[in-house]
Each structure stands twice: as structure tokens, then as C-alpha cells.
Regions:
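Carbohydrate transferase catalytic cores enriched for Leloir-type hexosyltransferases
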Residues: 1-375
């Protein structure tokens, strides 16, 4: 979500001064340095924490009631009202979106609590109820909804009956820091990567499917004993279970756990990897395939939801349920140089079709339509 918000801020910078004034209001201090480098007017919010807490509590109320109550009770709503904006954009699925006095554009990144309810991080009883309340309000109480893809648009329409003309696909783009980063000798010394490897950057949530990936690696190594895998992500969630499985399968030297990787180092992994392998169950789309393509790294990915919409013919696809299909794709790319060259070329071409300037242009179109409707 942070990367999507970064893309929005950059896009709004290209709009500011063109018959509109853009103000960025923020509560998280992580945004301070980001906005210091932006030409946009940035306003730190004094009541962010309390206001966010109240907004979440008001999720239990009907949307119209929550809006009335928030005007009187929530100091953050009153603080934002003093900025006298005609339209707000909330990029992080915020509960505050439908509680504002002014029209607001919501963002819905995914509805996996509905489509992949077997995973506790999205579909446990409590998590489902909280997400369902939030997203139903976002879909039906906002002036418009941003989604990542046509698949995301369809999910919102199927789930909540939101009118088609209120939902606007605004796909993710790869972060600029990937193409701007310069690799130094310190990178090689810090990570000591194998000469040839697959890469998967993901926190160890069950839906990220690390366990099947490790099992697929074990199967692939029966014919490709030099195949190795590098996993990036903090040592939480299913990390211990994944590491234990790797050890049980005799892969302690073939699976490399590098922990959290800062943004400044991420491009180095993509550039050195044989390919990105991403067996996730969640979508509709994801940012890592975009990162890989822009860095010239082939993509192997789950054939789920909007993945084909995002990657087209620039990826190899497999069922995330099937260890056999995952290791089949990994084995196919491991030795086939022509295939790898073809995927790199197609990935770079696909990445060139949707860049920051395209994102900027699409956002201007969306804002024009929404402002015309709410004026």
C-alpha cells in the first residue's frame, strides 16, 4: 500500500497547479522525508492516531450514521475539514474514507477475505467480519473506488453491487527506486548469493505458499541438483515452519533465508536471479512481478485472478495448489536460455507499456470524471 501511495503522490505532483491545488495530509512520520522532496503542500495531522482509532470504532455503524457521528466526535474529521478540500483520496483502504464531510475516493486493493477465506490472515471469523464491514462501506459510501485491475473491478461489483462507473482500475507500477539503484561491492559481501538461484520476496504468511515452493524445489532438485532458492522476508509468521521443512527435505544448503531486504538492495536480487517464483494464492495482482520485469528478471507466477491481466505472455504460469506444476515451471526455466531471454524481453516490453507517466495520465482522467460527478 505504501508503494501505491507513493505512486499517487508522484502522480498528483504532475496535476498540482493545473486548475487544482493538491494538499497531502499525513499522520505517519514515515511520510515526512518522502514529502520533503515533493513540491506538494504537505500538512502533518495532529489528531491522526486518535482519529484513526475512532474511525475504526465507527465501522460498526451504518455508513450514513458514521458520517454524522464522526463530524461531531472525531477530531481528525474536523481537522481535515479545515483544509477545505473538495475531494479526498485515501490510498490505504482507510475506514475514515466514508466518514468524511467531503466526497472521497476509496481504494480497495483486494477482497481476498471473500475469495480465499480458507487462509486465517484474511478469512478467520473476526478478520472476515472486520474486513467485510470496512470494504462494504468503502464500496458503497465513497464517491469512487480505485482498484488494481479489471479483475479487481469485477470483484467489487460481484461482492457489493457497486455501479461499474464508480470503480476505476489504476494498476500498480514498479517503484522508481528499482531502476535508479546502483549496485555496489557491499551488496555481494552482505548477501553472498549463490551463482544461480530463484528469488521470492514475501513475508511468511500462509497464503504466500512458501511450504509448497520448498517442496517443489526438493522435487526439482532430483533432476537439477544445482537449483537453489533465496527467500527474503522477516523471521515471523511461518518462517520457522518453512525453515524446518527445508531442513527435513535436505535443503538446508539450497534454501537461503536472507531476512528483511531494504528497498535499496531489492533490485540487486532481481538482477542476479534466474527468475522470480511467486506461488501466492492472493491477488488480484501483485507488485513483485512488476519489479522483476522492470529489472530484467523472468517471472514464474500463480495462474490466479488478475495475474495474466498483469503479466500477459511475459511469465510462466502454474497452479499454486500443485507442487508438480511449480517445480515443472522452475525446471523448465532453469536450463532453457532461449526461454529465459524471451521472458526477459517480453517482461521489459510489458513494463514499458505502463509507467509512471501512464499512471499519472490515468489518474488525471479519473479525477476529472469524479469531480464532474460530485460537483
Amino acid at each position: 500500500m505504501f508503494q501505491y501511495a507513493q505512486s499517487l503522490v508522484q502522480a498528483l505532483s504532475s496535476i498540482d497547479g493545473r486548475d487544482v491545488e493538491v494538499i497531502v495530509a499525513y499522520g505517519d512520520e514515515a511520510w515526512r522525508s518522502e514529502l520533503d522532496a515533493s513540491p506538494l503542500k504537505a500538512v502533518p495531522l495532529q489528531h491522526w492516531k486518535r482519529g484513526e482509532t475512532l474511525a475504526k470504532l465507527f465501522m460498526a455503524l451504518p455508513g450514513s450514521v458514521a458520517r454524522v457521528v464522526a463530524r461531531w466526535v472525531n477530531p481528525l474529521v474536523r481537522e481535515l475539514a479545515t483544509l477545505q478540500c473538495d475531494l479526498w483520496i485515501f490510498p490505504a483502504q482507510d475506514a475514515l474514507t466514508w466518514q468524511m464531510r467531503e466526497p472521497a475516493i476509496a481504494t480497495i486493493h483486494d477482497l481476498m477475505h471473500r475469495y480465499e477465506r480458507s487462509f486465517p490472515e484474511a478469512g478467520s471469523w473476526l478478520r472476515f467480519q472486520l474486513r467485510e464491514s470496512r470494504f462494504r462501506h468503502l464500496a458503497n459510501q465513497s464517491a469512487a473506488v480505485l482498484v488494481d485491475s479489471e479483475t479487481g473491478r469485477r470483484h467489487v461489483m460481484e461482492s457489493y453491487g457497486t455501479p461499474d462507473d464508480h470503480i476505476y482500475p489504476l494498476p500498480y507500477i514498479a517503484p522508481n527506486y528499482l531502476t535508479d539503484s546502483v549496485e555496489t561491492s557491499a551488496f555481494a559481501e552482505r548477501y553472498r548469493l549463490p551463482e544461480k538461484f530463484y528469488f521470492y520476496p514475501a513475508q511468511f504468511w500462509p497464503h504466500k505458499n512458501h511450504l509448497r515452493l520448498v517442496q517443489a524445489l526438493a522435487a526439482a532438485r532430483t533432476t537439477h541438483p544445482d537449483m537453489e532458492l533465496v527467500l527474503a522476508g522477516s523471521t515471523k509468521l511461518e518462517y520457522a515452519a518453512v525453515k524446518a521443512t527445508a531442513n527435513e527435505l535436505g535443503l538446508s544448503q539450497a534454501v537461503h533465508f536472507v531476512g528483511y531486504v531494504p528497498d535499496s538492495d531489492l533490485a540487486g536480487f532481481y538482477r542476479h536471479a534466474r527468475g522470480l517464483v511467486m506461488p501466492t494464492f492472493f491477488g488480484p495482482t501483485n507488485i513483485p512481478p512488476l519489479e522483476a520485469m522492470v529489472c530484467g528478471c523472468p517471472v514464474l507466477i500463480s495462474d490466479k485472478y488478475g495475474m495474466r491481466e498483469q503479466c500477459g505472455d511475459a511469465a510462466l504460469y502454474f497452479s499454486p495448489q500443485s507442487v508438480e506444476e511449480i517445480h515443472g515451471a522452475m525446471s523448465r526455466l532453469w536450463e532453457d536460455e532461449d526461454l529465459r531471454s524471451s521472458l526477459i524481453k517480453k517482461g521489459l516490453e510489458r513494463a514499458s507499456l505502463w509507467k509512471q507517466e501512464d499512471f499519472d495520465h490515468r489518474l488525471r482522467e479519473i479525477l476529472g470524471r469524479v469531480l464532474d460527478r460530485v460537483a
